[in-house]
Amino acid sequence: MKDFIEPFLYPHNLFLWGLLLAAVRYRKTGLWLLLGWFYLFGNGWVANQVRDWYNHDVIAAAFQPAFQGNFVVLGCGGSAEQLPDCAKARLQQVADLLNQTSHQQPAVHITTLFCEPYLAYLQPLLQRPVRLDCFHGGATTYHEFHTLDSRLDHQIPLWFVTSDYHAYRVSRLAQQQGFDARVYAATSSTFKPVNCGAACMLTVNLSNYDLFAKLTAELSSYYVYLLTYRFTNWYQQ
């Protein structure tokens, strides 16, 4: 009973039910539209369907230890002294893959302005000889891919290691640039299914808004680039 009642007392669910009462009381189209938007983007069942699609169609890729190519770790900010959690997750993920592969001496290409903390974090995790190539690829993902396009051999298979919320854009850009590549995503809590219990269809969850915010930013960024890259060159500068 506690698990059923408790979610209704959270501020966002009090707002949801208050909004429903206001929509019923005043019968305004705008209130109903706001209620529908707030409910659909916050509902756990709806968000879990989106997570299932994304996890299976965008980032689900099984790594084969017999892989004989190289790896690319896209930078995730930081400074000369510190690494953000997203960078640590990507480096941990690529280290796990490197320690599985049968490739005798694979290469890891890391695109970041601050190479020293990335390399210092990665090297103790490695259990085999690895060729490390760290360089500043550019200010954005699009700059990084422009640099990678001219720097890497397109005939060598690649695994791109990035964060799950970044995987859609990376997979599309790798395909567009003609790389023989797959994407391995370091997981975050945002893309893990939320518990959808007895109160699921009557409440909203804040983590679902975070999910849709990240997906909106990811898809918007990529499709703006797709519409403009043919007649602009900002991503090359």
Label every model-predicted segment.
Residues 1-3, 103, 237:
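Short, Lys/Arg-enriched, disordered terminal segments
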Residues 43-212:
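A structural signal for short, hydrophobic/glycine-enriched beta-strand patches
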Residues 18-23, 28-44:
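Hydrophobic membrane-insertion alpha-helices, especially the h-region
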Residues 1-24:
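Membrane-embedded alpha-helical segments of integral membrane proteins
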